[in-house]
């Protein structure tokens, strides 16, 4: 994928860039693999806001992505199309399996139309193939990794994401996450070889507020710039109080300090001046 940079013909075009979509081979999705995707505007079933800065945006159809490929062990597939997915930053690949079934997967870097894809413990180590971590050589870059066996891919699914298998220790495999954290994962968990494609997605500049609104993102306003009636930080007399949400809740870390999965973390991600 390449980035197309606009000339500054208008203020909205200045510094704006888009994908040229040259890596796509099809413009319409497979009808049997799309579902309705309703918007919530950041509200729950009571109509109360639970996630700020969300609302509006273009309508989307949800593409059913196969994150559990273990039921296709030993069934080869061919990459039929590389498609755009409005619901994620990565591209998706349409697979035609030898048994006649069609499925979408996250498109790895370097995959192209006509490639052969395999699933199972005996699959070759090549981009797009899915197999257990215990069958993957140390040092291999992988993505779409399960956290629990047969639980479906949870880690490294966005554009350009890559995780390195750094070691194997008994029943566990050690993975270096994109954040720099090293974590133990059950060696029976599945992973897909290669990194996620569309890595240039991070270099796209929206250029104007309107493009963010097309994506369903609403403006972010600081509490200090509001009036006291609208936010606890509003007005000129905040008085050094700790930061809170518009509803007065303290802005604290949301991860439980005694979370059971903490024992799976071998080395924490670097932070502050130690981050590379």
UniProtKB/Swiss-Prot annotation:
GO cellular component terms given for this protein: large ribosomal subunit
Cross-referenced SUPFAM superfamilies: Nucleic acid-binding proteins, Translation proteins SH3-like domain
Biased composition (Basic residues): 255-276
GO biological process, one term: cytoplasmic translation
Bridged cysteine pairs (disulfide): none
Oligomer status and interactors: Part of the 50S ribosomal subunit. Forms a bridge to the 30S subunit in the 70S ribosome.
Top-rank taxon: Bacteria
Family, per entry: Belongs to the universal ribosomal protein uL2 family.
Keyword Cell inner membrane among UniProt keywords: no
Gene: rplB
NCBIfam families: rplB_bact
Protein name: Large ribosomal subunit protein uL2
Keywords of the record: Ribonucleoprotein, Ribosomal protein, RNA-binding, rRNA-binding
Molecular-function annotations in GO: rRNA binding; structural constituent of ribosome; transferase activity
PANTHER family: LARGE RIBOSOMAL SUBUNIT PROTEIN UL2M (PTHR13691:SF5), RIBOSOMAL PROTEIN L2 (PTHR13691)
Organism of provenance: Bifidobacterium animalis subsp. lactis (strain AD011)
Segments for region (Disordered): 1-58, 218-276
Composition-biased stretches (Polar residues): 16-27
Alphabetical list of Pfam families matching this protein: Ribosomal_L2, Ribosomal_L2_C
Keyword Ribonucleoprotein appears in the UniProt entry: yes
């Amino acid at each position: 994928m390449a980035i197309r940079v606009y000339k500054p013909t208008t203020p909205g075009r200045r510094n704006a860039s888009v994908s040229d979509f040259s890596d796509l081979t099809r413009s319409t999705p497979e009808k049997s693999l799309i579902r309705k995707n309703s918007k919530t505007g950041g509200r729950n079933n009571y109509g109360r806001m639970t996630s700020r800065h969300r609302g509006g945006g273009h309508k989307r159809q949800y593409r059913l992505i196969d994150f559990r490929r273990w039921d296709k062990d030993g069934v080869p597939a061919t990459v039929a199309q590389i498609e755009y997915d409005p619901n994620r930053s990565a591209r998706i690949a349409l697979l035609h399996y030898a048994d006649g079934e069609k499925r979408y997967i996250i498109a790895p870097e370097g995959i192209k139309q006509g490639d052969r894809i395999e699933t199972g413990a005996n699959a070759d180590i090549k981009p797009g193939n899915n197999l257990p971590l215990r069958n993957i050589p140390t040092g291999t870059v992988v993505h779409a990794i399960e956290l629990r066996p047969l639980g479906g891919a949870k880690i490294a699914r966005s554009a350009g994401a890559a995780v390195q298998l750094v070691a194997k220790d008994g029943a566990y495999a050690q993975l270096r996450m994109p954040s720099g954290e090293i974590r133990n994962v059950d060696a029976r968990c599945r992973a897909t070889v290669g990194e996620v494609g569309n890595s240039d997605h991070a270099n796209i500049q929206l250029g104007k507020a309107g493009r963010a609104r097309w994506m369903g993102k609403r403006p972010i306003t600081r509490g200090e710039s509001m009036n006291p009636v609208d936010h606890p930080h509003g007005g000129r007399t905040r008085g050094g109080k700790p930061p809170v949400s518009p509803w007065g809740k303290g802005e604290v870390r949301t991860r439980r300090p005694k979370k059971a999965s903490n024992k799976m973390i071998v080395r924490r991600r670097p932070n502050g001046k130690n981050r590379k």
